[in-house]
Swiss-Prot record:
One of its GO terms (cellular component) is cytoplasm. It is found in: Cytoplasm. [4Fe-4S] cluster 2 binds at C82, C86, C89. [4Fe-4S] cluster 1 binds at C56, C61, C67, S298. Pathway: Protein modification; protein lipoylation via endogenous pathway; protein N(6)-(lipoyl)lysine from octanoyl-[acyl-carrier-protein]: step 2/2. HAMAP family: Lipoyl_synth. Its EC number is 2.8.1.8. Binds 2 [4Fe-4S] clusters per subunit. One cluster is coordinated with 3 cysteines and an exchangeable S-adenosyl-L-methionine. SUPFAM superfamilies: Radical SAM enzymes. This is Lipoyl synthase.
Amino acid sequence: MSAVAPDGRKMLRLEVRNSQTPIERKPEWIKTRAKMGPEYKQLQQLVKGEGLHTVCQEAGCPNIFECWEDREATFLIGGDQCTRRCDFCQIDTGKPQALDRDEPRRVGESVVTMDLNYATITGVARDDLEDGGAWLYAETVRQIHTLTAEREAGATKVELLIPDFNAEPEQLAEVFSSRPEVLAHNVETVPRIFKRIRPGFRYERSLEVITRAREAGLITKSNLILGMGETREEVSEALQDLYDAGCELITITQYLRPSVRHHPVERWVKPHEFVELKDEADAIGYSGVMSGPLVRSSYRAGRLFQQAMEARGVAAAGSAQAAQAV
């Protein structure tokens, strides 16, 4: 077994240990069928013809057909090297390139070209930057809102999936000031195994980020990945923790191992458990829940946003105002 990662660097001890376990065979329910509707086909041709880049196609997301049919897509900002390492994430850890200050404009132009209804922006942790990359995240939201302001179908909604910025008040304030429609920060796993799976993050700090976003008036969202060593009871506790912290939207998914260097799959969660977890999250009080083996944090993101708006009474208030104006 080679002790060298694909990018040529020496593998970490954890990666060497992980690589002793072969890639697991997926159960029969971990599969999807391609349903290529007209909107998907149009976007596929557009992305290819314009040389655009989205996480959707580059990561081989199984939900691309559904999301693109809704004119939703996800973009990665900040480069392809993260300053932190999570044991489930396919983005590599290393020294990032210099900050590309034109990236927000280019992402905004891509959103315009694709005529998206909803864009999810995610990115790498940039602890090498003085502001942790806060300006980059915020400016990308601002560019999308500005460039799509005159869009016939309405300005593109933006979901911003952020690292924790070490919960630094100034950095979070910069990000929150851009007013994304949804502010997402993914906790991903439960407290007992959190440090092992996400050594660069802290569970309580992640909850704090969600709380601060909610206090800033933003719709909040998080994600839990199952199959990395958690127990069923711990998942229930994490769902309650997130809700108590102010989380309104939640996605729950099965861990799929990116390579032998990553954490082995410890269990395959059966479909009925995902249904049970959705019912449980609904009962706790979440405004919107997506739970399933192939759900990803940006899956049906626009629909979850609408559910959160309805739960807040925004849609009802808007209808009442329209009726009064007639």
